[in-house]
Amino acid sequence: MNRREFFKSAAALAAVGTVAPKALAHAAKPKAGNNPIWLMTSAFASDPDFESVVARAKQVGAQGLELCVFRRDTDRQDHIATHLDYDNFTPERAKKVIDICNEEGLRISVGAYDNLIGGKPELQVVNQNHILKLVRIAAMLGGDANDVVCGTFVGYDQALAAEDGGFEKNLLKFKKVFTPILKYAKGLGVTLCVENCPMEGWVPASSSACYCNLPGCLAARKLMYAILDDDSNLQETYDPSHDVWQHIDPSDVIQAMDFRKLRRVHIKGTRNFPNDAEAVNWGRLFPRQRVNAALEKKAGLPELVSDEKGGNWDRMNYEPRLPGFGGSDSCDWTKFLETLMAKGFKNPFVIENEGFNSSHTGNMGATLQGFRATILNTAPVVWPLGPNGYEFDKSALKPMTTPNVNPKVVTMADLA
C-alpha cells in the first residue's frame, strides 16, 4: 500500500466512524512476508569459529549467518574472516554444524569474496580452487536442499580491460573460468551467488578506472547469464548500497532484473556526499584521481590520503552506514523493502556491517548495536505483526537435513 492508498483508506474509515489505532496500523502496513534476517560474519573477524558467531547471532536476534570462509593467507586486507576450517571439513563436522543450526533455529550459507579472473595468474587459480572447496562444504551442509549457497565475487582482469573491447573480453574470461566451477557445483546441488560490489578499492587511487568486479552493474549480470551455456545454478546476492553511490535507485534495479535470479539481499547503507569539495572538484560519475601531492596542494584541491590509510576506497564521495543506526542514509529503505515484498521475495536478508559508526569503530558493542538496530529497522516491513510486535515466525523454519556426502577435494586442474 502506497501513501496515497493509505490516506484514502483512512478517510474511508473515518467516514463511517470506525477509525481506530489498530485499524490504521493495519491499513498502513504493507503485506509482510516472513523473511529471515541474517548476519554476514565479516564483522566478527576476531571470533575464531562457527560456534562463536552462532552466539553473536543469538545475541542480536538474527535467524541465520552468511559464514565468511576466506583463505587465511588471502591478500585481501578488508572485511575478511574465516569461521569454518575449509581444509579439514569432514562429514562429522558438517553434521555438527547442521545439528547446531537446528538446535538454535539458525540457517547458514558460506562465501568468500576474491578476484577469480584478474590479478596475478597464480593467485587467480588459488582463489578459484578455494571457491571449489567452499562449494564442497556447501554440498556437505545440504546445498540447495537446505538453502546453503556459496557466495563469491567474479572479479575483473584490469589488463584485459585496458584493451579494446576489454569489457567483453572479461565476459569471455568469466565464461571460461566459471563454466567448470558451475558444472561442478550443479553436480553437487549447490548454487553460486555472485555479489555486485564494484570493489573500487582493489586498484590504487592512481588508477584512472576502478571497476574491479564484473557483476558490478545490472547490464553485466544480464550479459553473464546470456553468455553461459547453462546459467541454471548461478544466482545473485544483491547489495543496494553499491547502486546508491552510483546514483541509481535500487528499487528500479529490482524491477528491471530477472527476479528469479535473486537469492539473497545484503542490507548495507550508503550516505552520499554530492556537495563535498571532492565531488564538486572531481565530479560524481568518475573516481577521484591521485596526483602529485605538491601539485594537488598548489591547485587547492582536497588531499587524498594514502592507499595505506584507505585512500583507494575513498574516491566516490560516500560513507558506508547501517539503515536505522545513527541517522539516515541515501537509500529509500521503505520503498526498496516494499518493492521486494510486493514482488514476493521470500529469501534471507543478510546484514553486512561496514558502518563507519558500527563495525568500523573496532568496538564490538557498537558492532552488535548496529546489527540490532538494523534488524529492528527492517522488521516492520518483512516480518508479520504478532502479540509481541514484529517478529519472525520460527514455526516456518524447516529442519535442515544431513546429507550423506563426502565429495573429494578438487582443483581447477582436475576439472579441466
Model feature map: region roles:
Residues 9-21, 94-110, 116-238, 245, ...:
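Active-site acidic/histidine proton-transfer and metal-coordination neighborhood
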Residues 35-41, 65-67, 108-111, 146, ...:
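Hydrophobic faces of well-ordered beta-strands that scaffold small-molecule active sites
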